[in-house]
Amino acid sequence: MKVRLLLFAQYREWAGQDEVELDLPAGSTAAEAIQRLRAEPHMSRLSAAPAIALNQVYAPLSAALSDGDELALIPPVAGG
């Protein structure tokens, strides 16, 4: 199944692009998609547990993915 990951801020800078498409086995979870992305050398700094939104709704990392899903990785917010 194909899942589109949307990258913002520092995640976009590390990847050099604003989205990545992953081909994952059926029944994969958001955590497994993130693990696959972290295996890329330029994305190894990515937290194993970033905030995520699945199809524009905040979701837990245990959320099951389906073909065509959009998974947004939300970077930490800093500042004051």
Please name every model-derived segment:
Residues 1-79:
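Ubiquitin-like/PB1-type beta-grasp interaction modules and other compact soluble beta-rich domains
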